[in-house]
């Protein structure tokens, strides 16, 4: 791991802002988020605008992890899952279509 990779591993994806003010990435343990109004909630649930809905779907801590992994791998984005089985299911559901077969 070169110096650039070490810097990315430590800092990529996290911006210290006046509202957060944290030097290190906090571990968000909330389960749900507040919506401005019903239109805001509808836009979030329909993916018309980015934001947080429910922590098992996405949260700021996972976002930083995904951004760091993407930076380290030179990618555009990354997906963090809660388990290897979830990673396999996500991959297969993304790549396979009706009628495809898997040989294991």
Regions found by a protein language model. Name each.
Residues 94-104:
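Conserved PLP-anchoring active-site segment centered on the Schiff-base-forming lysine
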Residues 1-49:
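N-terminal glycine-rich, Lys/His-bearing helix-loop that initiates the first secondary-structure elements
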Residues 37-86:
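Conserved N-terminal alpha-helix of the aminotransferase class I/II PLP-enzyme fold
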Residues 2, 57-61, 104:
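Catalytic cores of large soluble enzymes that bind and process phosphate-bearing ligands
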Residues 26-27, 77-79, 100-101:
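Structural motif
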Residues 87-95:
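Buried hydrophobic packing segments
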